[in-house]
């Protein structure tokens, strides 16, 4: 075999059987760009969702605040309308009550009277001071309004008068209860009652506070003693003056009687008519 033919066969054997493809660089860049666009779209969607949620919450808060403001700022006309609606409701209940029994009617009237009395008492002492905290109801605070109806009662501890907090409110309580209790002083058991009552009222005070109260009572006792002594002296003087006047009258009467006897003896003797 000649050398030229050998070279040709060697070149044919070393030639590639299939063509070599170029790397798909362009395709990879396109895919990366698409993925970046998708991520950006997701981020934008998340941001939009957050903004919508914030806007929704802000709108709800604003609506709630406006509703509360409207509820707290009712006009006079609105309040009147509400009261009229309440009256209409009560009238409707009264019309429905036409079919109620006599016992049910008495019970309804009793309940309405009790509510009316309580409302009247609260209105009477309105502004004195109201406590929002409801205390446990004690049996001693329940007062029977109607002696014939044991169920017709009222809890006086709920009245504003008995929940004072300021000096003025305590003064009002004193001026209200003082005359009511003081008018019982002529009764025979009043002194013992007042002793026990004062002791009960002051039992939770400190010793120095009780001493102040005792000093006030001592001063009152001294004033009363002076008044009683002055009245006693005045009575003695009046009695002595009255006794002196009576004695003087008796003395003058004796002199007149004596003169009358002398006149009868001297001027009109029995011998003068002989």
UniProtKB/Swiss-Prot annotation:
Stretches for region Disordered: 1-120, 227-246
Task: Please classify the protein's predominant subcellular localization into one broad category.
Answer: cytoplasm
Kindly list any coiled-coil regions of this protein: 46-112
Renumbered to this chain, the Basic and acidic residues biased-composition regions fall at 51-67, 79-92, 103-120
Q: Where is this chain compositionally biased, Acidic residues type?
A: 30-50, 93-102
Q: Give the subcellular location.
A: Cytoplasm
An example GO biological process term is: formation of cytoplasmic translation initiation complex
Cystine pairs annotated here are none
Q: Keyword annotations for this protein?
A: Coiled coil, Cytoplasm, Initiation factor, Protein biosynthesis
Q: Which PANTHER family match?
A: EUKARYOTIC TRANSLATION INITIATION FACTOR 3 SUBUNIT J
The family assignment reads:
Belongs to the eIF-3 subunit J family.
What protein name applies here? Eukaryotic translation initiation factor 3 subunit J
Q: Name the species this protein comes from.
A: Neurospora crassa (strain ATCC 24698 / 74-OR23-1A / CBS 708.71 / DSM 1257 / FGSC 987)
